Amino acid sequence: MAKLHFSLVAPERELFSGEVDMVQAPGAEGDFGVLANHAPFMTTLREGKVTVKDGATTKVFDIQGGFADVGPEGLTILAEHAVEAA
């Protein structure tokens, strides 16, 4: 399976950067998932959870709004505030 490059950035620091299988995020108009080679798009994000899946490993981050940009290089989320969920 092809990998997706994903970066999660908050004003304080970069929380995650790496190659993953899939990312799910809380879009302003509904949740969405991104896999490798996804069509490009940009959207705003609402408060919610970003779930990062890579094989059997899952990481979850709580975010409070922001922007998501899907392009040829992968997915970048610029969050207003983000922390790794406990």
Swiss-Prot record:
One cellular component GO annotation, for this chain's record?
Answer: proton-transporting ATP synthase complex
Superkingdom of the organism of origin: Bacteria
Query: Could you tell me where this protein is found in the cell?
Result: Cell inner membrane
Can the keyword Oxidoreductase be found in this entry's annotation?
no
Per UniProt, what is one GO molecular function of this protein? ATP binding
Q: Does the keyword Transport apply?
A: yes
CDD domains reported for this sequence:
F1-ATPase_delta (cd12152)
Query: Which keywords, in A-to-Z order, does the entry hold?
Result: ATP synthesis, Cell inner membrane, Cell membrane, CF(1), Hydrogen ion transport, Ion transport, Membrane, Transport
Record's subunit section: F-type ATPases have 2 components, CF(1) - the catalytic core - and CF(0) - the membrane proton channel. CF(1) has five subunits: alpha(3), beta(3), gamma(1), delta(1), epsilon(1). CF(0) has three main subunits: a, b and c.
Assigned protein family: Belongs to the ATPase epsilon chain family.
**Which PANTHER family is this protein grouped with?**
ATP SYNTHASE DELTA/EPSILON CHAIN (PTHR13822), ATP SYNTHASE EPSILON CHAIN, CHLOROPLASTIC (PTHR13822:SF10)
Its job: Produces ATP from ADP in the presence of a proton gradient across the membrane.
Name of the protein: ATP synthase epsilon chain
Q: Which organism is it from?
A: Caulobacter vibrioides (strain ATCC 19089 / CIP 103742 / CB 15)
